[in-house]
Swiss-Prot record:
SUPFAM superfamilies: ARM repeat (SSF48371), RING/U-box (SSF57850). Its EC number is 2.3.2.27. This is U-box domain-containing protein 4. Keywords: Coiled coil, Phosphoprotein, Repeat, Transferase, Ubl conjugation pathway. Residues 347-360 have a biased composition (Polar residues). ARM repeats lie at residues 530-570, 573-612, 614-653, 655-694, 696-734, 736-775, 778-817. The gene is PUB4. Residues 416-428 have a biased composition (Low complexity). Residues 229-303 form the U-box domain. One of its GO terms (biological process) is protein ubiquitination. Residues 330-501 are annotated as: Disordered. It comes from Arabidopsis thaliana.
Amino acid sequence: MEVLLRSISSFLNLSSSKHIDLDPFEKYYKRVEELLRVLKPIADVVVTSDFVFDEKLGKAFEELTQDVDQSIDLFRSWQAFSSKVYFVLQIESLLPKMRDTIVDTFQFLMSSKNHLPDELSPASLEQCLEKIKHLSYEEISSVIDGALRDQRDGVGPSPEILVKIGENTGLRSNQEILIEAVALERQKEMAEQSENNAEVEFLDQLIVIVNRMHERLLLIKQTQTSSVAILADFFCPLSLEVMTDPVIVSSGQTYEKAFIKRWIDLGLKVCPKTRQTLTHTTLIPNYTVKALIANWCETNDVKLPDPNKSTSLNELSPLLSCTDSIPSTGADVSARKVSNKSHDWDASSSETGKPSFSSRATEREGASPSRPASALGASSPGISGNGYGLDARRGSLNDFEDRSNDSRELRTDAPGRSSVSSTTRGSVENGQTSENHHHRSPSATSTVSNEEFPRADANENSEESAHATPYSSDASGEIRSGPLAATTSAATRRDLSDFSPKFMDRRTRGQFWRRPSERLGSRIVSAPSNETRRDLSEVETQVKKLVEELKSSSLDTQRQATAELRLLAKHNMDNRIVIGNSGAIVLLVELLYSTDSATQENAVTALLNLSINDNNKKAIADAGAIEPLIHVLENGSSEAKENSAATLFSLSVIEENKIKIGQSGAIGPLVDLLGNGTPRGKKDAATALFNLSIHQENKAMIVQSGAVRYLIDLMDPAAGMVDKAVAVLANLATIPEGRNAIGQEGGIPLLVEVVELGSARGKENAAAALLQLSTNSGRFCNMVLQEGAVPPLVALSQSGTPRAREKAQALLSYFRNQRHGNAGRG
């Protein structure tokens, strides 16, 4: 009891903490405080009296001590820029437990057969019990759970729900929302380092919710009443106001100087828009954008706002405004028209005679009903047509909100506590894999940006795979799996002033466009297992026994043997070598045709783990594994298909296997998995198709199998596969069939988005694809220009990777030559 009292006192002393008066911490501190102030007098009496409590009561006091200590840890561990949403979910999962334990404690005291101190009369205990029971609060965690369910079902969450979440978690302004997104990314980074896959997926879902809050603010801003439409790219993502002093940060994004400076001064060294770590904090004036804005304002008689008089960063664009005026985020934002009639907007609407800054979303002709239109045809006053037949365009946000972030199946068992489905929870939480469920965690660094790479089995502690090297594009534009070339073009940089303003306009891109799997830092590879390795002779003996069991006619024996081999192959490279030399590979390949799904899953996962060793790669291919792997790809369980695709990728690292796999008919099933598989399966299929697309003969087969349509769909940031999809598309863009498919499927607008807002590697690959499209087709060249590719290409030519700069400069040079050529023929 003395320990409990010390814990209560420690918690109450937190009232002097510097963060305790911040929202939402003050609210939750008071809730815990109310519970403990009812409990403390009772605990004081028990300690000072001779009362002897029984085992049940003693256990209740122990649980209370643990709960109080947990709450202390939660409040003490919160730092500036920690996630508020994550804190709320954690504390709300603890509060009901603490409250119930206190109720149980009081009831145990009332029913105790031991003599109670006079101060603990039944009446006083009953009074305390009633106080506790009446301390009930609305739990926002249940609202968040509902929003996550709606999100996974593709029906929401609604604006009202977003407002409710924002109000109850202290996210009421644009800056608070942007900081929360960064905080959740960092929280996810920690979960990734500890390989807590369920937590990573859960945090991904929360990040999408926060992104939608930001999208809502943008939508409010863009739908404000105005007689003049303004380019969305003239708005600062931080201030949501038109920029008067635009500057470029190291990520290549442009912000209002005063706002991004204050952001950096807060200690935030992350780009608010792309979440990339800022490599330096130098702010480079963007004179081109500044001139364009000034010219536009003069043409349209619009007065620029005074940045010094702008609303405080902490009071920007309140989320609460216009709840009923903005369509649901579950609706197709990009396929609606916004009326020009006056609305009762929030206080940020213009009250002067001058037009206020806004954007009006209009329908884009030919927009696919199955995918949000990425360009919307609202013409901007003061910008006319041009020799290329350009129609200056602008539009609303990319509506990634309709698509659920369909990562590995996730559900919430309790507020703030995420888990995967019941069939897989054990393997994720305990770091173990059941016989029928083989989860893989990263064993290699991603080759496409920082997205997840085909991996070995759960808790893989092996060395990085030798094939895990960055994708880079060669001179032809094709991307290869290999070190990025350090050479860069000597093309002279040109200012945007070389281009007419006619080429500057573009439709609004997803202003908060990001990839759920984008990292703030590189993935940490697990250290070798701490378990003491057994003597190799012991492993050899065990493997020899298991190889004999693989030959058994008993399904149970085969199932158990394949499961044990899979686990052995998971642990370390020595085991893989022993198994590879034991003759097990041929038998495992044969078992890929097993009618027992568990045996088949074990066999394919064992082969995947074994293939991490390069010698085993060759042995697996020589054992005739390609066709059996295709059989699994076509007929296996979801997890077996995933691991089959990952194994095919691993084998395709060897050049001759690329040809064998392509000629064996694997491309069709891989494309089917790409379009219809699980999120994990889609990633594995995309990575396998990337390696296969390096071989020239495979490219046409990949296009003919319908891969381009699926790849373009997977460029939706919510899918977490933007970089993977762009890498494959860049290779396919080197053949005519690939270019035609990309153009026909609407890939050009999305590639331009990646150039503007993607990761460093994504920008490079997207620029390579656009270069192929533009230089080989006048029609596609015009489409690229119409999508407003020039400004992001100029930014990329100055701040991208060496090869990205080379591609961007080559494309800008081509545009310039085309324009001058057309002028000469005039």
